[in-house]
Amino acid sequence: MQAELQTALFQAFDTLNLQRVKTFSVPPVTLCGLGALGACGQEAQARGVSHLFVMVDSFLHQAGMTAPLARSLAMKGVAMTVWPCPPGEPCITDVCAAVAQLREAACDGVVAFGGGSVLDAAKAVALLVTNPDQTLSAMTEHSTLRPRLPLIAVPTTAGTGSETTNVTVIIDAVSGRKQVLAHASLMPDVAILDAAVTEGVPPNVTAMTGIDALTHAIEAYSALNATPFTDSLAIGAIAMIGKSLPKAVGYGHDLAARENMLLASCMAGMAFSSAGLGLCHAMAHQPGAALHIPHGQANAMLLPTVMGFNRMVCRERFSQIGRALTNKKSDDRDAIAAVCELIAEVGQSKRLADAGAKPEHYSAWAQAALEDICLRSNPRTATQAQIIDLYAAAG
């Protein structure tokens, strides 16, 4: 009896200890530098892919931006079927249509070429096509799944960091809510960071996606699951964004600034993929889906307000964020001021009301935010009433 009790106690302690274990994961291969896109064919060939399903932003496809990708694949004898993704954030209906087309074309690998919406859609497609008995709504981070198709991610904006995360965000066609799924299988095999493909991104999109990357880095640095690995990536990303985002917005042909933003976005993605995000993302998903607000813009509307809410438990961390953004000694209030200044400098100082938000929306949004997976790692507990107040403050 005593031995059995001792075994049970040890098992209980082991379980508790495992709950405290934190993980850190990144894509197996990340290529960066001007011309890196030219390596796509080689990376596909190395993974035994003979026919790639190329999911591409419809505007980029019409503009002929996939030509370098096509040349790279042709040089290695890899066939391609192009799927122009509809504009806007991905909906499960669009994902299912892409899965059907991939099967019909008999492709054995996926390339995502576009912004975060395209990358998120491609990750879902690569996973669902090999798991036909599964649905995204039923999947969790602990689901046992068949291996997805080989996946190469080529971001054409610097913001989501989706090329280096185990997360995808898809809009549910019935509820209209954003579904956030985290699973190890969603991590791409290869991330290709080539600043040349971001050179033509308009200033407003550059600004919105850049603030999204900043939000990722700040929330990862503040997250409950932060580690020394994620801290180094997040604080480094914050410093790079503070220096490079205004340059990339002000002069889009500054390829050094563009490359720094791609790297910072990737670093922030690596950080939050392991550390988690927080209340800003949990709140931003709700008006973003309901009012079709671009994700980076929704984050810009809410980030300073949420930082003010979290400040009481993040004073030291926020001081480091302020130092990274301003390159001088800062306190927690300085960090929030520096974030507000950067948001204003790149033209993203808007309020929720500017996008059509009304006070009667706040209660339902707050309840949905409480159910959002991103809230798990927020450093301060929030109630529905507090979240309603935060929406009102940002309104």
Swiss-Prot record:
Cell location: Bacterial microcompartment
Top EC class, one word: oxidoreductase
PROSITE patterns given in the database record: ADH_IRON_1 (PS00913), ADH_IRON_2 (PS00060)
GO cellular component: bacterial microcompartment
Example GO BP: generation of precursor metabolites and energy
Binding sites annotated in the UniProt record for Fe cation: 212, 216, 281, 295
Induction: Part of the 17-gene eut operon transcribed from a single promoter, induced by ethanolamine and adenosylcobalamin (AdoCbl, vitamin B12).
Pathway: Amine and polyamine degradation; ethanolamine degradation
Annotated keywords: Bacterial microcompartment, Iron, Metal-binding, NAD, Oxidoreductase, Virulence
One Pfam family of this chain: ADH_Fe_C
GO molecular function, one term: metal ion binding
Binding site residues for NAD(+): 57, 116-120, 156-160, 178, 197-201, 295, 354
Reported phenotype of the disruption mutant: Unable to grow with ethanolamine (EA) as sole carbon source. Slightly attenuated in a mouse model of infection. Not required for aerobic growth on EA supplemented with cobalamin (vitamin B12). A double eutJ-eutG deletion is not required for growth on EA supplemented with vitamin B12. A non-polar deletion mutant grows on EA at pH 5.5 to pH 7.0 but not at pH 8.0 or pH 8.5, releases increased amounts of acetaldehyde on EA plus vitamin B12. Preventing acetaldehyde vapor loss allow growth up to pH 8.5.
Catalyzed chemical reaction(s): ethanol + NAD(+) = acetaldehyde + NADH + H(+)
InterPro entries, alphabetized: ADH_Fe/GldA, ADH_Fe_C, ADH_Fe_CS, Alcohol_dehydrogenase_Fe
Cofactor: Fe cation
EC number: 1.1.1.1
PANTHER family according to UniProt: ALCOHOL DEHYDROGENASE, ALCOHOL DEHYDROGENASE EUTG-RELATED
Protein function: Probably acts on the acetaldehyde produced by the degradation of ethanolamine, producing ethanol. Expression of the eut operon allows this bacteria to use ethanolamine (EA) as a carbon, nitrogen and energy source. It relies on cobalamin (vitamin B12) both as a cofactor for the ethanolamine ammonia-lyase (EAL) activity and to induce the operon. EA enhances bacterial survival in macrophages in a concentration-dependent manner, suggesting it is an important nutrient during infection.
Record family assignment: Belongs to the iron-containing alcohol dehydrogenase family.
Name of the protein: Probable alcohol dehydrogenase EutG
Organism field: Salmonella typhimurium (strain LT2 / SGSC1412 / ATCC 700720)
Lineage: Bacteria, Pseudomonadati, Pseudomonadota, Gammaproteobacteria, Enterobacterales
